[in-house]
Design a protein with these regions (language model features):
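Sec-dependent N-terminal signal peptides
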Residues: 5-13
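N-terminal signal peptide c-region/cleavage motif recognized by signal peptidases
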Residues: 14-18
């Protein structure tokens, strides 16, 4: 029943594997570190959906946002966070890519590069300013790691591994791969907050669209 409401099946024809995602996935900037099983899950899902290499970066950025913002939420709750992120990408008030939307906020330059006046701009290192981002996990000062398994023993952390797989899968669907389309269950929301933790001052100026799990969605 849930898939009929949130995930609409699409027709995919002639899909054939073109190589391992583990081989195709190149180095790129993203916010979180992935444990070995988190990487394996990512590669498995990219392979299954036959996602072209050029789409990997945006998929990972969205998947990380879903995971850190809604790890403990249901599939419906995770899809809702994905939809808010997508709605922002499609809204001219926000940047036009998933990575830019997720990482939006003021930055500061690292002292390591700031001390070199003649260093080219593309070689400078910047970090987000603490607690100044659109999505709090990205600049809360904590090290972001997707712990799908324990570091020493390698044992799977079932809840985290499942949440990461769901986040990756939803992100793949949002990007038009994997055979399902993610319908907007937030009714066009571009804001949300965790109502069990906080009531933000800006909420009084926004319109409520829906409540899903521990998040209130607004536009």
């Amino acid at each position: 029943m849930f898939k009929k409401i949130i995930f609409t099946a699409t027709v995919l024809a002639g899909m054939t594997a073109t190589g391992s995602a583990a081989e195709k996935l190149k180095s790129f900037d993203h916010a979180a570190e992935l444990t070995s099983q988190a990487k394996t899950i990512l590669f498995q899902e990219l392979n299954t959906a036959d996602v072209p290499n050029k789409g990997h970066q945006q998929i990972v950025c969205l998947a990380e946002n879903i995971y850190f913002e809604a790890r403990a939420e249901s599939m419906e709750g995770k899809a809702a966070v994905a939809n808010v992120t997508r709605n922002r990408v499609e809204d001219k008030r926000w940047p036009g890519t998933y990575c830019e939307v997720v990482q939006q906020g003021p930055v500061r330059e690292s002292w390591k590069t700031k001390q070199h006046a003649d260093l080219p701009d593309d070689q400078r290192i910047y970090y987000p300013r603490k607690h100044r981002c659109q999505f709090s996990w990205y600049c809360d000062g904590k090290k972001d790691i997707i712990w799908a398994n324990k570091e020493k023993s390698g044992l799977t952390i079932e809840g985290n591994a499942r949440a990461w797989r769901e986040a990756v899968r939803i992100s793949i669907y949002v990007h038009g791969h994997g055979g399902f389309r993610v319908n907007d269950n937030t009714k066009g929301a571009v804001y949300y907050y965790a109502h069990n933790l906080v009531y933000p001052t800006w909420a009084d100026q926004k319109d409520l669209t829906v409540i899903i799990g521990n998040h209130t969605f607004m536009k």
